[in-house]
């Protein structure tokens, strides 16, 4: 009898050749279709942000404090305290955030899923989540995994003795791994850093948007660049990686010192004796990975990074011990029992050593990683650390604020914060926006805009440019705040500064006359343009509008932190800043995903924008109509017309010719033609090209447009 499975493989439940295997160059529309009802086990009307308001916060915090000192035999706590473990669970949840695209971070509970649950840098965070499970089980729907993991780290620091800065609830769990996050191209864990740097000697040449030096790490290699100790080189990598998650040198030094004030590294054993990571573990392991298969593997015999030892004399207490240890001793390179490079003091009194995690009568050698040594060797970090040493209270305050920033950076603006411990202060990295007025007449504003002489293209383009900066990844950007009129946005090439200045001059005058914020006037301008274009095409529509946007000021805006929000391409306006290795249609998909659009929404917006005269610089690519300024489905009708042919005519330029006469009718970009060439996008385009769907096209365009304009309105229910 054949050894093959007797069951017919009717369902692709595990492996099989995928479309991506057959056609690796195809675009991945799956990134637009994530986190829907089919993967979410919660009831359709479940609203976590309302449910968490019912939480008994004090009871939860009390239970977490008890957990910190409730050592479990199956995974005993070091020195009887889990504070180091839960600080690490929270840190490694939040620490995957990167400023470049806002992706990663602790806002979704993604540490529960691959690849993060099985990253080499996340060894044994699975044990932390299992220790949290009884608490999650008890409080159920009132606390998300995302909130619980981050809160556990904050409570850990409080138990250790730190006065924390605050905490906000509001992180909503996802139910499958994100498909849109690019973690790197490497095919092996901890592949050499050279694979993601143009020049590993120049940290700023790391591939964007990455913010970790190797595949599977949160930040840097604790042993040194590519595992070779050199504190100054490591300092340069530390500076770059932390900058890529929006931390300055002082915040970086504080986080390094404070992060290593509690807990320890684990490397007292052989790494090769560990079982597979959670995602590869056999079913009997029940999602737990890295278990020691040849020894005890817990307590003092635990293996995580391979480095072995604590940084301070009192690893469960918040104090200045890290500074005392690092700056009051000379250090030499040693190998841990697991074979990892670590720094150990050349000469240290026994009473200054930390005790064994299980037996307080035994003293153990303290350690420093290469990243710790970087704080001493690098002159900038050294100066900051000495400032902290001279003022311990300032250090504690700086760390507490940096920890709050680390764990809340991807939660979005302060309007999204929930709970009794939300700090009163407005912090500049939260992109604060003042409340806007609602005491004005919307129709009066619209009438003034309509009589201003602005074209449909000018009105719609300005509203779009203001709103398109929104990123659902970290809830930054968007039309609220009208930051399009501030640096750096007002000079971005993608915003056509000359055209923008002309429109803003009109809108600022209307704002002053009516009491509406400039932000509201900008969005209303888009509404006026769309309603005018729809009427010209025979459709009487009203674009929904929400009053109350505010106008941010330069003082409220960290211009440098907004630089990563600059669009390098905008397929919706048929524009690229320059040629890139990445295809234009892939950049369109990325933009659409960050804006929270679905495939059909992206499609209908492209078709509508093309006929409204919104192309950047007035280019004619994709304007498949002789009725520009009317909201028609002509783009789709002519794109899908087999009476045409499509021929390359230069770099990212194509000609649409009459099939019989060969006369050029229109020109197009790759972004235009992908809606006819990609089978999925063509299926959407055909819907909007149908004779009976012109009204549907208009209604769907208005709905998608409104979604974009309101994406950042967290200030309203």
UniProtKB/Swiss-Prot annotation:
One of its GO terms (biological process) is cellular response to hydrogen peroxide. Belongs to the peroxidase family. Peroxidase/catalase subfamily. The record marks 88 as: Transition state stabilizer. One of its GO terms (cellular component) is cytosol. This is Catalase-peroxidase. The keyword Metal-binding applies. The gene is katG. InterPro entries: Catalase_peroxidase, Haem_peroxidase, Haem_peroxidase_sf, Peroxidases_AS.
